[in-house]
Structure formats: C-alpha cells, structure tokens
Amino acid sequence: MKKHLLFLGPPGAGKGTQAALLSAANSYLHLSTGELLRKEIDLDTDLGKQVKDIMNRGELVSDQLVLEIVKKNLDKDNNGWILDGYPRNLSQVNSLNDVLININQPLEIVFYLDIPDEVLIKRLLIRGRKDDNEKTIKTRLKIYKETTEPLIEYYKDLALLENIKADGDLKTISADIKQKMACR
C-alpha cells in the first residue's frame, strides 16, 4: 500500500478531514502545516519561537521555515505520512522534492479534492468560523487558484494525481480515496 501521500484542494474541500481519517486508519503521520506550526510554538522550540515572532508581527511564515518544520517531522520513524496543506506553490514543491529525495521517501499519490466553488462557499458559510464570510472565502479561493491550482497540472504530468469528487458525503469520499489507493 502507498504510504507517502499529499492532499490538495481549495480551503474547505475536506483535506484535513480526509487526511485525518486515512491517517488514523493506517497509522500514518498526518502532517498539517498549521498544526505543525502551532505544535512548535506550544513546545517552545527554537523554530517555534521564530514562528511565534513572525506570526505576532502578522507576517507569513517563510517557505524555508515551513520546510524545516515539515522535514523535521518527516525524518521521524513512521509507517507513512500524509501532507495536508503543503506544498502550496511550485517553489515549495521543488524544495519538498529535494527533501523527499534526500530522505528516500518519494511522494506516491496526490489526492486532489475537487469541489465546485458554489458548493465550497456554501459549506464554508455553514462551517461558521469567524473568518468564513463570503468576501473572505472568495479572496481565499482567488489566492488558491493563482498559487496552488498549478500544482494540479504538475502532479498530473507526473502521473501522481488522483481526482476525488469532494462534493459528496464523508463516507463516499473516503471510499473513493481508499479505492484509488488500492488500485495503485
């Protein structure tokens, strides 16, 4: 079974939910960049102190710093891993590829959670986070389409991409992911 996976998709597509379900079922590390950054801050590590300082200034954490934190977690003994929310752009893809080659853990499947914008907007509004209003959601989708969507073609060209219809119910989406993993 494939053990080195990546979940791509727009905000609210269900990446974190599906990655968590799959990692729990297979004892894989679930590496969500947001959670990894918060963990470093909570543990008060040197990296965490840098991240906290950057975030307190309202700035974005650099690609290099995020990569260091991801690499630190990939280096651990594991039964496999799932990346969720990283990489987000082609520059990050290239840096990640170098790390994965170095640790001999190549990416094996990229699941693209495909969902129509109107379904996504409705889902996010129902979710009800305080930053989930229609204007903010549309801005996040625009940024996603500009920076992250090009990764879909990149991974498709490498024959790593599996398209998952993500506008269905949780069980149907999970079953589709498991079925596509079994066929690889």
From Swiss-Prot:
Where in this protein does the record put region NMP?
Answer: 32-61
Known function: Catalyzes the reversible transfer of the terminal phosphate group between ATP and AMP. Plays an important role in cellular energy homeostasis and in adenine nucleotide metabolism.
* Organism (species): Prochlorococcus marinus subsp. pastoris (strain CCMP1986 / NIES-2087 / MED4)
Recorded protein name is Adenylate kinase
**Entry's free-text remark on domains:** Consists of three domains, a large central CORE domain and two small peripheral domains, NMPbind and LID, which undergo movements during catalysis. The LID domain closes over the site of phosphoryl transfer upon ATP binding. Assembling and dissambling the active center during each catalytic cycle provides an effective means to prevent ATP hydrolysis.
Positions of the region LID? Answer: 126-132
Q: Which residues bind ATP?
A: 12-17, 127, 168
Family matches, as InterPro entries: Adenylat/UMP-CMP_kin, Adenylat_kinase_CS, P-loop_NTPase
What NCBIfam families does the record tag this protein with? PRK00279.1-3 (NF001381), PRK14527.1 (NF011100), PRK14531.1 (NF011104)
State its Enzyme Commission number(s).
Answer: 2.7.4.3
List all membrane-crossing ranges: none
The UniProt family comment states: Belongs to the adenylate kinase family.
The reply on keyword Kinase is: yes
The gene behind this protein is adk
Where, by residue number, does AMP bind? 33, 38, 59-61, 85-88, 92, 129, 140
**Which reactions is this enzyme annotated as catalysing?**
AMP + ATP = 2 ADP
Q: What is the annotated quaternary arrangement, including any partners?
A: Monomer.
The entry's cellular-component GO terms read: cytoplasm
Q: Is Phosphoprotein included in the keywords of this UniProt record?
A: no
Enzyme class, broadest EC rank? transferase
